[in-house]
């Protein structure tokens, strides 16, 4: 349900006929996307000196003309009139996304409205470079395409919703059910700092809809705008985010539901990856906003993967095999902070953070009784940063040699894990885990512009574990898929699964 705030009728188009305050202005030139059918004159004499966008009477502070594309007073127009000159994008987009998709429950597929201020004598209190462009594309299983766009400029707003085909009642309902999810995504992207709230969109009805795409370009007054690109369908989920602080991307392929484990296995794998990222962010000084957005997306996309219908699996796996896999869909992701050069006397010392993680799974064979599986996990961290000689001291690096007192750390970490599984004549014949972890820290100490220490701390771990005997102790029930979902309860399966999960430092646990 969308709540519409009260707005004075004097700033809205009058659909019953406009008096002297409203005229069609042939001399007014607007962008092609905002061609007026109604112009509302707002006299400066009728406004107060308030710095607020609207006076108590509903007029614009500073006077001006409100130009509307369509002469209607619908709830969306009311929201636009109330919000389009707000001081933040979060306020401007508040409730609009949900209201637009809610309309599909009312039989409406197309909507178009715009409003723009012309001739205002007082500038908006919002930053002059504030703008926002958001588009949502929804494809139905029948092939219909629904497009929605919201554009917010310094002195105007433009909204369009269009369907290229007639929608069924079921399709309308599925689209309307995305209202809260779409609004949550907008609220997250427009807040400062931004967040990725994609759970509602990722849970779209796959019986009626085939894909959902969300794109945004937003600027809350920063020098560099932020952008996000989200794609969701039944087999793939992907997001790319670009901020002034850096970029992150994640893609998850759910096209092979056979490798998805039990709920407990998936939860453990998600928690482990998040823990590894947190460790990398602390070790490499990663940007917290990008780290948080990656974790939100990773949790959401793998939650979506867990809800897929596993009845379409061509190659069911038994409990022993699932223990050798993470339980997650294959993925690839990265975080790259924008490099900085904080030391003017040594510009070659770059502060940076680059983290990547991935999982890939390959199958050979086409039956449950005879096949091999190889699953590879990889994680890499490259980072560099300056820090003070004493914790808590501010770094005040300048061209003055006396300011050159700091540590410069360069991190280069790499971790890999490979699981090899083989079934032959219905029996598990291979369950091998090969893992390695390398951590390298190169540290330079500078005192009054002189390098007083320069050393490297290397670290290397490697192991190969044969887990076949441990897994063969787990009983199977003889059903076609030989699975009783013991992955969350059997101690041997839990132990094996914990060993499988990729870590930047190998634990002392083994198969004993």
Question: What positions do the PLM features span?
Answer:
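Short, compositionally biased, intrinsically disordered N-terminal export/targeting signals
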Residues: 1-74, 78, 82, 141, ...
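N-terminal, intrinsically disordered, small/polar-rich Type III/flagellar export signal
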Residues: 90-216, 222
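Long, low-complexity, repeat-rich, intrinsically disordered, solvent-exposed domains used
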Residues: 134-137, 149, 160, 202-262, ...
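A eukaryote-biased signal for long
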Residues: 229-512
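Alpha-helix boundary/N-cap detector
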Residues: 67, 84-91, 95, 166, ...
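Amphipathic, non-membrane alpha-helical segments that mediate helix-helix packing
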Residues: 69, 75, 82, 93, ...
């Amino acid at each position: 349900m969308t709540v519409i705030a009260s707005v004075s009728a004097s700033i809205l188009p009058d659909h019953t006929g406009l008096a002297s305050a409203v005229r069609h202005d042939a001399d007014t030139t607007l962008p092609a996307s905002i061609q007026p059918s109604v112009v509302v004159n707002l006299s400066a004499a009728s406004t107060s000196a308030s710095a607020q966008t609207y006076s108590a009477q509903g007029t614009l502070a500073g006077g001006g003309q409100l130009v509307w594309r369509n002469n209607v007073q619908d709830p969306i127009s009311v929201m636009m009139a109330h919000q389009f000159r707000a001081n933040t994008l979060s306020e401007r987009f508040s409730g609009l996304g949900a209201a637009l998709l809610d309309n599909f429950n009312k039989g409406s597929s197309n909507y178009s409205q715009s409003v723009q201020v012309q001739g205002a004598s007082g500038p908006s209190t919002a930053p002059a470079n504030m703008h926002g462009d958001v588009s949502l594309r929804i494809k139905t299983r029948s092939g219909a395409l629904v497009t929605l766009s919201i554009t917010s400029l310094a002195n105007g707003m433009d909204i369009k919703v269009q369907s290229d085909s007639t929608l069924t009642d079921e399709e309308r309902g599925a689209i309307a059910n995305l209202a809260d999810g779409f609004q949550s995504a907008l609220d997250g992207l427009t807040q400062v700092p931004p967040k990725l709230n994609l759970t509602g969109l990722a849970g779209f009805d796959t019986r009626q809809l085939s894909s959902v795409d969300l794109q945004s370009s937003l600027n809350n007054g920063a020098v560099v705008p932020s952008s996000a690109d989200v794609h969701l369908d039944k087999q793939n989920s992907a997001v790319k985010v670009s901020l002034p602080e850096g970029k992150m991307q994640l893609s998850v392929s759910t096209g092979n539901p056979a490798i998805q484990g039990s709920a407990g296995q998936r939860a453990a794998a998600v928690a482990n990856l998040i823990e590894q990222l947190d460790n990398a962010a602390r070790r490499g000084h990663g940007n917290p906003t990008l780290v948080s957005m990656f974790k939100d997306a990773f949790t959401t996309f793998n939650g979506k993967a867990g809800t897929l219908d596993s009845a379409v699996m061509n190659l069911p796996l038994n409990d022993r095999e699932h223990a050798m896999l993470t339980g997650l869909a294959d993925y690839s992701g990265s975080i790259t902070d924008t490099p900085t050069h904080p030391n003017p006397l040594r510009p070659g010392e770059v502060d940076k953070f680059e983290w990547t993680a991935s999982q890939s799974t390959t199958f050979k064979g086409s039956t449950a009784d005879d096949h091999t599986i190889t699953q590879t996990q990889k994680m890499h961290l490259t980072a560099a940063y300056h820090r003070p000689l004493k914790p808590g001291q501010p770094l005040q690096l300048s061209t003055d040699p006396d300011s050159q007192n700091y540590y410069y750390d360069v991190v280069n970490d790499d971790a890999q894990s490979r699981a090899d599984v083989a079934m032959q004549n219905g029996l598990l014949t291979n369950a091998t885990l090969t893992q390695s972890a390398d951590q390298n820290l190169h540290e330079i100490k500078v005192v009054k512009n002189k390098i007083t220490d320069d050393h490297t701390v290397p670290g290397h771990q490697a192991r190969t574990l044969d887990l076949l005997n441990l897994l063969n102790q787990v009983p199977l029930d003889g059903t076609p898929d030989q699975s009783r979902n013991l992955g969350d309860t059997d101690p041997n399966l839990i132990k094996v699964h914990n060993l499988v999960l990729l870590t930047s430092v190998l634990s002392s646990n083994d198969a004993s």
